[in-house]
């Protein structure tokens, strides 16, 4: 029987030994006598000792485990250190059985850049021209396409095959025909490049995130942008200039000349504060003189002939964020960019007349050197990412 069970069975405290003097007679007049001799005290002594001893045993037996447990770890500092060491390096510290500790948490991790580099992009391939289409009627060239490629979304910039959807020379001067040929790409994640040539040979256009089609309101996304490629006269470097280690971007854009037997290869980057994206490129080569051709298209063609040094400035005008007037098409016109009653690029339904003004959508300059209004000599629409559809 435990101590607490005994307390419940005997709620009254255990009688203790009292001195002999406390034992007295009963009330006066009574005949009963209370024992007062040494015989009574000696008979109660074993029970008293047993009670005291049992109480001490019960007390120490209840307190000793907690005291021993509380004093065991401080008394042995090496045990505590060993326990902590095992905890920090235990394999059970996986976040479930303990606090997660990475295997190399306290180690210095040395990382080096990967020597692997993404492969270079394959050159753009322009497909879709008819075999009998003359070079003078082919507006977009590979050199200009490479410049446009830099600005298109990444998912399309890795595509190296551009397919001709519409050509004014091959399909006739009709905006309706242009809409019909582009309609088959509805719902596909592709991009379109609109290319225009004016009467002075200037080449410009737009990148369209959606296929051009008649719609009651503006459509498209901020991926759209306007662009232009203009020819600029440039002086050759002086004889004392060292162009051996000249660095910069290079492209293969050149112009036809009357003949020369010297050549210089140079390339420069030009960024104007007013233009969000612009590039100036230059190349000259030396071979036999080809027949002279005044076609403006040959200013951008890659020729195996003698050329003069000519600078081609390519400018792109990305979305400005001012408004969302990306593309607006109706049966009688096609427009890209707008604001304040002006269009960034506008073409009529006969693809004969065009308008280009500064627009809030792209913050562009006039795209044609003819002025705000220009005459159209050629129009092309190219699709990127169609997979040969």
UniProtKB/Swiss-Prot annotation:
UniProt domain TLDc: residue ranges: 138-385
One BP term from GO: response to oxidative stress
PROSITE patterns: TLDC
Region (Disordered) residue spans: 1-45, 67-90, 238-269
Subcellular locations according to the entry: Mitochondrion
Residue stretches of biased makeup (Polar residues): 22-45, 241-256
Composition-biased stretches (Low complexity): 257-269
Any one cellular-component term (Gene Ontology): mitochondrion
SMART domains cross-referenced by the UniProt entry: TLDc (SM00584)
Disulfide bonding pattern of the chain: none
TM stretches of this protein: none
Keywords recorded for this protein, A-Z: Mitochondrion
Function: May be involved in protection from oxidative damage.
Protein name as it appears in the record: Oxidation resistance protein 1
Designated gene of the protein: oxr1
